[in-house]
Amino acid sequence: MSYRAGDAARRARERYELKQAAAEFYRKLSVTERLEEALNSTFCLGPEDVYGHLANYFAQFSKPPTICQIRGRKVLDGTGEPTVEAEVFCTVKNMDKRICSSVISAASEHPKASKGPEQESNHSADIAIQWLNDLSPKLRGMSPDEQNKIDQLLSDFYQPKIEEEKERRQMEREASPMPLQPEPSPVTSPAPGKKKGSGKGKKAAVVEKPIPPEETPEAVVPGSPAIGALSLAVAKASSVLSKTPLYLHIRALRNEKLPTEFFMPTPMISILSCGTSSPGKLNLMKEVLIIPQTGLTVQQSLDMALMLQNQIVKQINAASKTGPAIKNVSPLGCMLIGGDRIEQPLDLICEACQHVGLELGTNLYLAINCAAHELMDYNKGKYEVLSGTFKSPDEMIDLYVDLINRQPAILALLDPLRKEDTVQWESLAKALGSKCYLFADAASKPVCKLLESGSMNSPPCSGTVIKHTNEITISQLLGVFKLIEGENRVAVLGCPYKESVGDSTADLAVGLGARFVKLGGLLRGERTTKYNRLLAIEDELTQAGALGFWTKNEFPVLCEVQNQPGPQETPETQ
């Protein structure tokens, strides 16, 4: 009898202690007060979906989402080569959910690296997946809002990988030493002022100075796309969880306060490709791009580009003697055509403009991606602008000056010279810098080197084409855009030659505040996806009354002595 009484008393005491613990638990979390508030507000509001209202009310008191897993998958980029997709999973309201993913393609500083075998891409993707698996426990429990902290962790993780890759390559060089490359022999040319055949005896000759040797290209570490893809995926996860468009999230990372007006980047749209991979003799124009006049919307710009492109196709078909010409498309998303003269692609565009009622230099401008680093013949020490036609770095300056004098609608030259030809870059800046943008793409330092140097003066250019590839983090992108603006240069956000399918580049361009965006042409899906995203962003800004327009093209002052500036556009209001 006494045993039963004692057992009942023990159970009663345990129930009492449990009730006290529950009361203390709910008291600490203010559950009873918030539950009372929720019930009162629900009764007063009388929502149609009572449980939906209660769910929304209590959601504001839930813990912030945290990363619970990072996963990597092998996917294909826009050219069918393997790359890596980084997926971010977060714990949201006690549930593990897949939030988003991102894909970026690998790109090399070396022009020939893009021609590597498929097994190298496979190897890089496999390593990237392993890196993402290794990074998963390091990021577990962190908030996607901690972009700077996560990017620093990624950079710290990546730094030893660079050293390992350098050591591996050094060991390979020591094991199988490469033969020394022959230095280009000095080139002789007639003395200035001497005409061929003038005077008696031998003609005086001038020995041209040998070109600077090619700099050692920055090594691309296999697996590096894992870093850039994961950094972007974290930014996307934060924007998804906060229900904020990615471009607004990026701008918030850049500025403490969001601006009241956003300026859409002006698209540089690829129309033709006449580079080293195209048929015909012409090598100089890897891309011929159009730049719409200021004051136009992205929609108006794309409509104009599409109209011009269709007219060019008609002209090519009309000139073909065998019926409609086969439309070869470059990975850049534009038509690949042959040319035998430097002016030939420009003449084709001029003729198309006349047919559709557009005026070059008024409605639209031209840009040329020269990709000079792909034209250099190191044995001759000259650029092969046409098959069998070679130009020294000094002669290239005369070529560009003459070309722009004959076609003043050319607004920009991309990579007109190698980065090593710094003296000629300075001469070109003096000759054309006040009326033509001189952009460095492959001629620019890598993003990490730009941030280390804190300078945009090598080479002296109007601005830089920045691409989100390999190990570049979102924080580094923010830093390099701040540097470009601080140096009063022009920022261009571009895509690599082999681009992945995704539209985040458009958000990055708007969020980072790029003046121009270079996405390629309109003939490949991975390119048009990004243009479509630009259109969607423009529509959102229009609906919000926050869309602004550039009113003129301003050229940075590159040197103390420059030629007179080119024609300015009349400001427009829309």
Swiss-Prot record:
Basic residues bias (residue ranges): 193-203
Residues given in the record as substrate binding sites: 287, 518
GO biological process, one term: glycolytic process
Protein name: Enolase 4
Entries under InterPro entries matching the protein: DD_ENO4, Enolase, Enolase-like_C_sf, Enolase-like_N, Enolase_C, Enolase_N
Name of the gene this protein is made from: eno4
Keywords: Glycolysis, Lyase
CDD domains reported in the protein's UniProt record: DD_ENO4
Its EC number(s): 4.2.1.11
Composition-biased stretches (Pro residues): 179-189
SMART domains according to UniProt: Enolase_C, Enolase_N
Organism this protein belongs to: Xenopus tropicalis
Region (Disordered), start-end ranges: 165-221
Pfam families recorded: Enolase_C (PF00113)
Family according to the record: Belongs to the enolase family.
Pathway membership: Carbohydrate degradation; glycolysis; pyruvate from D-glyceraldehyde 3-phosphate: step 4/5
Gene Ontology cellular component annotations, sorted alphabetically: phosphopyruvate hydratase complex
